[in-house]
Amino acid sequence: MAVQQKIRIKLKSYDHSLVDKWAVKIIDVVKQTDAIIFGPIPLPTKTHVYTVNRSPHVDKKSREQFSFSSHKRLIEIIPTGRTIDMLMKLELPSGVDVEIKS
């Protein structure tokens, strides 16, 4: 029995609605090819916090904190012949980072 190949697509963005929207679009495209889909699986959100001094010269105790969160989703696909062709035609926005592993 042959081992089936899996495609893992990881979506990353600072905007959670953008990640969710494009995860749904990818799933809709893949469903047209009759491939098996697992996901979107939400991965842990990482929050980055940066602390800076408010004043450039004095008042070391006066600081301000900035934070942003990076949201991730994972989609696993067991592809058919047309799945990869359909995924290559898909154009994603610049706000979403896509990582594809097989």
Curated annotation (Swiss-Prot):
GO terms for molecular function: structural constituent of ribosome; tRNA binding. Pfam families: Ribosomal_S10. One of its GO terms (biological process) is translation. Gene3D superfamilies: Ribosomal protein S10 domain. This is Small ribosomal subunit protein uS10. Keywords: Ribonucleoprotein, Ribosomal protein. InterPro entries: Ribosomal_uS10 (IPR001848), Ribosomal_uS10_CS (IPR018268), Ribosomal_uS10_dom (IPR027486), Ribosomal_uS10_dom_sf (IPR036838). Belongs to the universal ribosomal protein uS10 family. It comes from the Bacteria. Part of the 30S ribosomal subunit. One of its GO terms (cellular component) is ribosome. Involved in the binding of tRNA to the ribosomes. The gene is rpsJ.
